[in-house]
A protein has these predicted regions:
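Conserved N-terminal phosphate-binding loop of PLP-dependent enzymes in the Aspartate aminotransferase
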Residues: 1-280
Length: 280
């Protein structure tokens, strides 16, 4: 599984899969706060939280005494998937693009879960109107066949021909499937359909939220939605939100499966129910 390799695990925020490797993982990775509006890491939320988040990153990159070397790249998900379906604020993404350009740092956007119409656009970063330096994509592009693609700007193309060769790379059937998937998505306006169905699903989830206070935060883009389950009886955090109810999520997942609905879990303490329905 690609995501369990040494390099990929070094970039993962979740500690669980990383523990067995311990010191073998790269120590050249610096994690930064993500614009998690419902539980803002700066205790602010909204536009103020976004502003402080960007200021923190900009100061870290420009301060020679910050103790952090200028990175080769900044890697980000425009919508966090396993992290709990957290959509990055669009102004934050624009600010991130501005900061990385000014610093001469490549911006890599991970679209493996969010790409190919899932969020109502072909790629989730398009909602912010930015252009990354590198885009990593997989999953949906292969139409169920194994295919992963890295798209990057010309100035990053320093490999010599054959330098990235491998026995199972460049599979012709998977590439043909990928081309067919992209044609289908465009010809059948799947992006527009996913955006409309996502609005519909969000609307119905918010109706349920009125009667069930355990549905703390409903978020996402298009048909990549998440519901953060909370314990209304617990002590609120600095923003006034109840604590995550991680024990409830698998119970909800199990009951939904009994009724023919497949859901995934993610987020802190596994407390986010993830909706990733078919796009068609």
């Amino acid at each position: 599984y690609h995501g369990m390799s040494q390099g990929a695990l070094s970039l993962m925020g979740s500690l669980g899969p990383k523990k067995p490797l311990g010191a073998l993982l790269s120590n050249g990775v610096q994690f930064m706060p993500y614009p998690y509006d419902y539980r803002c890491p700066f205790g602010l939320g909204g536009a103020q939280g976004v502003k402080v988040n960007l200021s923190y990153l900009e100061n870290l990159l420009n301060d020679p005494e910050a103790g952090v070397q200028l990175p080769a790249a900044v890697i980000v998900e425009a919508v966090q998937g396993e992290g709990g379906v957290i959509p990055a604020d669009l102004d934050w993404l624009r600010g991130l693009r501005r900061i990385t350009e000014q610093a001469g740092v490549a911006l890599i956007v991970d679209e493996i879960q969010s790409g190919f119409a899932r969020t109502g656009k072909m790629f989730a970063f398009e909602h912010a109107g930015i252009i990354p330096d590198v885009v990593v994509m997989s999953k949906a592009i292969g139409g169920s066949l194994p295919l992963a693609v890295v798209v990057y700007r010309d100035w990053l193309d320093t490999w010599l021909p054959g330098a990235h060769a491998g026995t199972f790379r460049g599979n012709q059937m998977a590439m043909a499937a990928g081309s067919a998937v992209m044609r289908y998505l465009t010809e059948h306006k799947v992006c527009e359909h996913a955006a409309a169905m996502g609005e519909r699903l969000s609307e119905h989830l918010r109706i349920l939220q009125r009667d069930f206070p355990q549905l703390g935060d409903i978020r996402g883009r298009g048909l990549m939605l998440g519901v953060e389950l909370v314990d209304p009886t617990g002590a609120p955090d600095a923003l006034g939100h109840p604590p995550i109810f991680g024990r409830l999520a698998p119970l909800v997942q199990r009951e939904c499966l009994k009724r023919g609905l497949i859901l995934e879990l993610g987020g802190r303490h596994g407390g986010v129910v993830r909706f990733l329905p078919p796009l068609v």
